[in-house]
């Protein structure tokens, strides 16, 4: 029987420490794909080699586990920041640039400020500090995994609040993603103020 070697979630952070960086933040986003709601980004500086049992890619965790870990991360982090870019900003500057804007806002909240950012994915911009991008970073880096959880939990909670405001769309269930139920509601009720109109163009053209 083949056993997978456990991933050292601190590997990228250790490399950064070895290169002379002391304050290293992980950055990730939640909500790039949905048809409604903002994109959320989080930035987290963890104490070196902090062990948080169950810390892994937020997409693989149950909602309950994510929320539990969110409380642990916010309690244990050296610093963390959470920020949004609105659906209007997404429509104005596109989802990639809006994601970078949310990341920039999240990092600006960190005190002390980070010396290096580890960012999930393979694309970045000039954030005014050194950046290292890591593909699938949310399952390879402790700092990015922590940021992923904070972003997802925060955005999910916001979409649950929007569900109370616009109950006909089912935001509490699908969080704004393009499910059958969501498209059916759009056909019946049309869009609401938190829908991303640039994401709905093809839907309405058809």
Task: Give residue ranges: language-model regions.
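RNase H-like, Mg2+-dependent phosphodiesterase core
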Residues: 1-206
């Amino acid at each position: 029987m083949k056993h997978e070697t456990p991933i050292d979630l601190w590997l990228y952070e250790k490399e950064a420490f070895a290169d002379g960086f002391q304050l290293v933040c992980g950055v990730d986003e939640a909500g790039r794909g949905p048809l409604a709601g903002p994109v959320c980004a989080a930035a987290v500086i963890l104490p070196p080699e902090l062990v948080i049992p169950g810390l892994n890619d937020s997409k693989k965790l149950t909602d309950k586990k994510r929320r539990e870990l969110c409380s642990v991360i916010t309690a244990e982090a050296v610093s963390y920041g959470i920020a949004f870019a609105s659906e209007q900003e997404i429509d104005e500057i596109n989802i990639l640039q809006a994601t970078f804007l949310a990341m920039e806002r999240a990092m600006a909240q960190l005190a002390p400020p980070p010396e290096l950012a580890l960012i999930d994915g393979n694309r970045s911009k000039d954030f005014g500090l050194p950046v290292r991008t890591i593909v699938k970073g949310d399952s390879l880096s402790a700092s990015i995994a922590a940021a992923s959880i904070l972003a997802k939990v925060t955005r999910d909670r916001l979409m649950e609040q929007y569900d109370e405001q616009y109950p006909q769309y089912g935001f509490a269930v699908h969080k704004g993603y393009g499910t059958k139920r969501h498209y059916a509601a759009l056909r019946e009720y049309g869009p609401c103020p938190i829908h991303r109109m640039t994401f709905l163009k093809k839907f309405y053209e058809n």
